[in-house]
Structure formats: structure tokens, C-alpha cells
């Protein structure tokens, strides 16, 4: 009995000790987590403010948890509540990047802002941008985008890092060489000509001899055609079905992006979130079937006819087929023979759909709006198109390089209304820039592309005016500094698809100028705004009147 009682007491004592240790551990973990949270949400921001203040860099004060977000949201909301004034002004920076424009006037071109507890240092000097993107690029990397942003743009080339990024970039670059892109010109040209014929028929049916269309909506079909062919090549029909679903998914993700400040919103089983999840599963199943079919063809040695377009999906699959054939002989790290996993192929298809479609759509939209606003430049560009291409012939690969005026107009469009108004880099190590500024590791740098493009220090007093003539001697000589024009980024991470965007935009505008006079509609409200990319807040309704000199049934070969 005593032994039993003693055993019970011993067992109780042991249980108490375990409970005490567990409680102490729980308290320690709680205190440790609390200390880390306090450091991340309060003490680290204070240290960084002091660090940069000692270097003469200031900014709006950090507020617990929210940082500068409340002020930023208020400034952006106020700016977007009214259109541009005057309505033909191109001084869009105060509207598009209202927080940057406001705080720059107070703190100068370099200041510290807080996206919650995450600090970002603004850098707008071309020489420092050269360091960040070129001469010291190994010290910086792309920042980690928000999960909702990654859902929109995919975990493809845009968001990859290190060796994986290098492999994908090497494999995919082949698709965007000019010789390969030229093979798309007939396909894109016929698509644009069909669109023009539809607008011509609408103008005739309307009785007024002209038609109003929202080009921000209509151009999406043209750019989707091009990016589908670039991504899927001979599997175009299958790819078109997949990208139709991807377009719906983008619409849902865009709505979720607007609610990005609501914690956990993307996980809530709302009706649209459930539809989004279902679409994502179906897209993945469809792409898996397509990749499997194309992979089987690659294994059997089936290839497209010589001289056909080298599409993105084919390049990724062929890289894997080459790896299987060669057995990764020699074990070359990240050689093109290294296979790209199927999951990565899925993400690349999503990335190129978003980046390729939206970037080119926005470039085309703003270029058309600008030509409608500036009929003198529209007429100059039209005369050039007629001189080079004639009135009825679809522009060819031989024609496009000769359209110099149109090229100048595209560059000026990209300067005034760049697709991405800012870009962000993260310091991988502690870095001292050439001007002495010390950047701590993990610090994010915000490069305001639009602000640089509108800066009178580099572009002169007419920086906010539409003047394509500034690009008469090329982009590198258009400003006082060659790196004051970076619409597609800079360095090794420059947009891989920029050649496709430029080619498609130039070809589309040439065909439309052959066929229409373009005017702004009374319904057009000039209100550029940003949601990831720059776009017209209220659409872009323009009036197209068919040119009487153009044969109504001529849509090219």
C-alpha cells in the first residue's frame, strides 16, 4: 500500500514537473514570438528610420503596423477621384503616383516610405539605377511579390530567382529573337485586319460613317491572339481555350487584388474565390493534357515544319526532351538540356499570358489615345505608313523597320505612359552606393519609372508634353541621361517579351492608320490610373472613321 501510495505521489510529482516545464516553454515561446513581433513591427522600423536620418534621408513617419499605408491610400484615392485637368494634359504623375509626387515635394527625390512594416527607399537617379541593375546587380534581386500578385502573373520568369531563373531565361529567350518573331507578323496582321474590317462594317451600319469603340477592350482580342501563338504555336486552338479561362481567372484575381489589405481574403470561400479555384484547377488539367501531348510528339521526333515559329511551350518541352536524350551527359548545371518541370511550364504559360497580354494592350491603348489627341502626329505617321506600305497592303517584316516615325511615337508613348509605373529591388547584402548611401540587407528599393520618365532634369521643360521628335536619334539620345528611359526595365531582368510588344503595337497601329482617321470621343475621360499596370480608369472610347481613299473590302492577303 505504501509502495502504491508512494508511486502515486511520484507519478503526480512527475506530472507536475512536465506541466511546469511545458508551461515555462510555452511562456518562453510566447515571449520570444512577442519579442520578434515587437522588433519587426516597432524597433526595426525605428532603427531604420534613425539609420537613414543619419544619412540625411527622411520620409513620412512610421506608424505602428500600418506604416505609411493610410496616407498613401488617402492620397491615391483623392487623386483618382477626378480626371486629368486640363483633359489633354499628360502630366500624369500627380494622379498615378500621387503619394510619390506629394512626398517628393517635401523630402526630395530620395525618401523612405513604409508599406506596413516594410520599408522602401525611393531611388530616382539614373547613375544609381545603373548600379542597382547593371554594375552591382549581383547585390540586388527582385522582391517577393504578394501572393495575390503571383496568382495574377504566375510563378514564372518574372518572379523566379537564381539558377532557376537563369535556366528559364536561357530557354525562353529564343522565342523573342527578331527572326523568330517575324514569323508571327502574317498571323497578327490578318487578325488586326479582321478587327479593322469589323470596325469598318460597324461604321457603315451605323449610318454616320464612323464608329465609337473602347480600344482598351477591343485590343485585348488582338494581343491575346499574338500571345497565344507565341506561347502555344501550332497548338494555338488548344491554347486559345486555356487562355480564355485564364482571362476569367485574371478578372477574379484583379478583384482580389483590390482587397489585398483584407487579411486572408484570398482564402475565404466566397463565390468568386470558389469559381477562381475551380478555374485554376481546370486550367492546370488542360495544360497538363496539352503538355503531355506535345511531350509525346517531342519524344517521337515530331517537329514543326522548318521555318515555323518556335513557341514558348515547345522550347520548354524540347529542353526536357534534350535532357532525356542526352541523359544530362556531363552534368552541366543549368544547361539548356536540363529539364523544366511540368509545374514550371504551367506557371510560365500563366506568366506570359498576363505580362504579354496586358503590357501590349496598354501600349496599344495609350498610343491610340495619344494619336487621337494629337492629329498632327497621327497624320505624319499615316503618311509614313502609306509611303512605306501603301494603302492596302498589310505591313510585312521588311516594312516595319522603316516606320521610323511610328517607332518614335511608340517610344514617346512608353515614356509618358509606361506599362509598369515603378519597379522594386531588394538588397541581398549590405550595400554602399557610389554616393555613400548605406543600404542594409533586405532593404527594398522603389524605382519610380514614371517619375524618371517625366523628370525635367533629364527631359527638359517639356517633359510632360507629347513630343515624339525627342526620339529622332534613338532612345539612348532622347534624354540627358541614357538611363532616363527604362519602360521595360534594365539589365539581365529586362522584360524578355519587349520585342514582341513593340512589334505587335507597331504592326497594329500601321494597319489602323492605313484604314481609319482616329478622334477622341466626347465620352472619353482622360484618367490614367494604376492597378499593377497603367490603364485608363474609365476605358478609352475613341471614334474611328474609315478613310475614303481606302478600298472597303481590302484587308490584305
Curated annotation (Swiss-Prot):
Gene: CYP734A2
Gene Ontology terms for molecular function: heme binding; iron ion binding; monooxygenase activity; oxidoreductase activity, acting on paired donors, with incorporation or reduction of molecular oxygen
Compartments it resides in: Membrane
Known cofactor(s): heme
Chain residues that bind heme: 495
Membrane topology: Single-pass membrane protein
Protein name: Cytochrome P450 734A2
Signals that turn on the gene: By brassinolide (BL) and dark treatment.
Organism: Oryza sativa subsp. japonica (Rice)
Main function: Cytochrome P450 involved in brassinosteroids (BRs) inactivation and regulation of BRs homeostasis. Is a multifunctional and multisubstrate enzyme that controls the endogenous bioactive BR content both by direct inactivation of castasterone (CS) and by decreasing the levels of BR precursors. Catalyzes the oxidation of carbon 22 hydroxylated BR intermediates to produce C26 oxidized metabolites.
Gene3D superfamilies per UniProt: Cytochrome P450
Single GO cellular component term: membrane
Tissue specificity of this protein: Expressed in roots, shoot apex, leaf sheaths and leaf blades.
Amino acid at each position: 500500500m505504501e509502495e502504491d501510495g508512494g508511486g502515486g505521489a511520484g507519478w503526480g510529482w512527475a506530472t507536475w514537473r512536465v506541466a511546469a516545464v511545458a508551461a515555462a516553454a510555452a511562456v518562453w515561446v510566447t515571449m520570444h514570438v512577442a519579442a520578434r513581433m515587437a522588433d519587426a513591427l516597432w524597433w526595426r522600423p525605428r532603427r531604420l528610420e534613425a539609420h537613414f536620418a543619419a544619412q540625411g534621408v527622411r520620409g513620412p513617419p512610421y506608424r505602428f503596423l500600418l506604416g505609411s499605408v493610410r496616407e498613401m491610400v488617402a492620397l491615391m484615392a483623392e487623386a483618382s477621384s477626378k480626371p486629368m485637368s486640363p483633359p489633354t494634359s499628360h502630366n500624369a504623375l500627380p494622379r498615378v503616383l500621387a503619394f510619390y509626387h506629394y512626398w517628393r515635394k517635401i523630402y526630395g527625390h530620395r525618401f523612405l516610405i513604409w508599406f506596413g512594416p516594410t520599408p522602401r527607399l525611393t531611388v530616382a537617379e539614373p547613375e544609381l539605377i545603373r548600379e542597382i541593375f547593371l554594375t552591382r546587380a549581383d547585390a540586388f534581386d527582385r522582391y517577393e511579390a504578394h501572393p495575390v500578385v503571383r496568382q495574377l502573373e504566375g510563378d514564372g520568369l518574372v518572379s523566379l530567382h537564381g539558377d532557376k531563373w537563369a535556366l528559364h531565361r536561357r530557354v525562353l529567350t529564343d522565342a523573342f529573337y527578331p527572326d523568330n518573331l517575324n514569323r508571327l507578323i502574317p498571323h497578327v496582321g490578318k487578325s488586326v485586319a479582321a478587327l479593322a474590317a469589323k470596325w469598318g462594317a460597324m461604321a457603315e451600319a451605323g449610318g454616320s460613317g464612323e464608329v465609337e469603340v473602347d480600344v482598351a477592350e477591343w485590343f485585348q482580342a488582338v494581343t491575346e491572339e499574338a500571345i497565344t501563338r507565341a506561347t502555344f504555336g501550332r497548338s494555338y486552338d488548344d491554347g486559345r481555350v486555356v487562355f480564355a479561362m485564364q482571362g476569367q481567372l485574371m478578372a477574379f484575381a484583379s478583384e482580389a487584388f483590390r482587397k489585398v489589405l483584407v487579411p486572408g481574403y484570398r482564402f475565404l470561400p466566397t463565390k468568386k474565390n470558389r469559381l477562381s479555384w475551380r478555374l485554376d484547377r481546370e486550367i492546370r488539367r488542360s495544360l497538363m493534357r496539352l503538355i503531355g501531348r506535345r511531350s509525346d510528339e517531342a519524344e517521337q521526333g515530331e517537329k514543326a515544319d522548318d521555318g515555323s515559329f518556335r513557341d514558348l511551350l515547345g522550347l520548354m518541352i524540347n529542353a526536357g526532351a534534350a535532357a532525356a536524350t542526352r541523359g544530362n551527359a556531363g552534368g552541366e548545371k543549368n544547361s539548356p538540356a536540363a529539364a523544366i518541370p511540368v509545374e514550371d511550364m504551367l506557371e510560365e504559360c500563366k506568366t506570359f499570358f498576363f505580362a504579354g497580354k496586358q503590357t501590349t494592350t496598354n501600349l496599344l491603348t495609350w498610343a491610340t489615345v495619344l494619336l487621337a489627341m494629337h492629329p498632327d502626329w497621327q497624320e505624319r505617321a499615316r503618311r509614313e505608313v502609306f509611303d512605306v506600305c501603301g494603302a492596302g497592303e498589310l505591313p510585312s517584316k521588311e516594312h516595319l523597320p522603316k516606320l521610323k516615325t511610328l517607332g518614335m511615337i511608340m517610344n514617346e508613348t512608353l515614356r509618358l505612359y509606361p506599362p509598369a509605373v515603378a519597379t522594386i529591388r531588394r538588397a541581398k547584402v549590405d550595400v554602399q552606393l557610389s554616393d555613400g548611401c548605406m543600404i542594409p540587407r533586405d532593404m527594398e528599393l522603389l524605382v519610380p519609372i514614371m517619375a524618371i520618365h517625366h523628370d525635367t532634369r533629364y527631359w527638359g521643360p517639356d517633359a510632360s508634353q507629347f513630343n515624339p521628335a525627342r526620339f529622332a536619334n534613338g532612345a539612348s539620345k532622347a534624354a540627358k541621361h541614357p538611363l532616363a528611359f527604362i519602360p521595360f526595365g534594365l539589365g539581365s531582368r529586362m522584360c524578355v517579351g519587349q520585342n514582341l510588344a513593340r512589334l505587335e503595337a507597331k504592326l497594329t497601329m500601321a494597319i489602323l492608320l492605313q484604314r481609319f482617321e482616329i478622334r477622341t470621343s466626347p465620352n472619353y475621360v482622360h484618367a490614367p490610373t494604376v492597378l499593377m499596370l497603367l490603364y485608363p480608369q474609365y476605358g478609352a472610347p475613341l471614334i474611328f472613321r474609315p478613310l475614303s481613299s481606302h478600298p472597303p473590302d481590302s484587308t490584305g492577303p
